[in-house]
C-alpha cells in the first residue's frame, strides 16, 4: 500500500506536464494543457499570473514522484502566493512567515492539482493532496485557497472529504464558472 512518505515533491517542467498529458486527462478540473484555448492551458498551469514581480512571487509547480523517471510521475500541483486578503487570523502561530502580500496571515493559492489518469481511483490523489498540505504547513503557511474551474461534483466532494470548505462561487475569467474552497492550518 502506497504511503505519503513514498513520495516527494520536485520542481516540475513543461516537459513533465506534457509527458503526463500525453497519457490522458489527469486533473481536477479536467483540462488539456496542450491547447492554448483551454481555460487551464500550460501557461495558466504554470501560473505566471503575477507579472513584473520578483521571481519569488511566481508560482511553484511540483511533480509528485516515487522515483525520478518520467513514467513514475503520478501527480502535479501548481501553487502561487495568494493575492487574496483573508482578513484577520487571530490565532496566528508566531512562526508564520509573510508571503509578500501583506495579508493578515500567509496563504497560498492552489491553481491546479491532478493525478495521471492511469493512477486515478487508487487513493493517490488523497495521498498527494495530504503530502502537499503537509509541505505547505512545514513552510509556515496557514491558509490554502483552492480554485476549481468548471466545478464537478466529484472534484468538490473529493476536496471536501480532505477537509476543505467551500468559500464562494463566481465567474472567473471570461465567465468561466469557478469555485473557491479553503483549507486552514490546524
Regions found by a protein language model. Name each.
Residues 111, 116, 152:
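Residue-level recognition of the GNAT/N-acetyltransferase active site
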Residues 143-154, 169-186:
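C-terminal "cap" of GNAT-fold acetyltransferases
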Residues 59-65, 76, 107, 112, ...:
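Short hydrophobic/aromatic beta-strand element in the GNAT-like acyltransferase core
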Residues 2-56, 61-66:
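Short amphipathic alpha-helix that is part of the acyltransferase structural core
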Residues 70-112, 120:
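Conserved acyl-donor/pantetheine-binding loop and adjacent beta-alpha core of acyl/acetyltransferases
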Residues 129, 134-151:
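Conserved GNAT acetyl-CoA-binding A-motif
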Residues 159-160:
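Conserved active-site tyrosine of GNAT-family acetyltransferases
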Residues 119-131:
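Conserved acetyl-CoA pyrophosphate-binding loop and the N-cap/start of the following alpha-helix
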Amino acid at each position: 500500500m502506497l504511503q505519503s512518505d513514498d513520495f516527494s515533491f520536485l520542481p516540475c517542467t513543461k516537459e513533465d506536464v506534457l509527458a503526463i498529458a500525453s497519457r490522458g486527462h489527469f486533473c481536477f478540473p479536467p483540462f488539456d494543457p496542450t491547447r492554448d484555448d483551454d481555460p487551464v492551458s500550460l501557461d495558466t498551469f504554470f501560473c505566471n499570473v503575477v507579472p513584473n514581480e520578483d521571481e519569488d512571487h511566481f508560482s511553484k509547480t511540483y511533480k509528485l514522484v516515487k522515483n525520478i523517471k518520467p513514467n513514475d510521475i503520478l501527480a502535479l500541483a501548481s501553487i502561487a502566493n495568494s493575492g487574496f486578503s483573508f482578513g484577520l487570523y487571530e490565532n496566528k502561530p508566531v512562526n508564520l512567515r509573510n508571503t509578500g502580500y501583506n495579508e493578515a496571515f500567509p496563504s497560498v493559492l492552489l491553481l491546479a492539482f491532478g493525478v495521471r489518469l492511469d493512477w486515478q481511483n487508487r487513493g493517490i490523489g488523497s495521498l498527494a493532496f495530504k503530502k502537499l498540505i503537509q509541505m505547505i504547513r512545514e513552510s509556515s503557511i496557514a491558509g490554502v485557497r483552492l480554485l476549481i474551474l468548471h466545478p464537478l461534483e466529484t472534484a468538490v466532494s473529493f476536496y471536501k472529504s480532505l477537509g476543505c470548505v467551500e468559500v464562494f462561487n463566481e465567474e472567473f475569467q471570461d465567465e468561466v464558472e469557478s469555485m473557491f474552497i479553503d483549507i486552514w492550518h490546524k
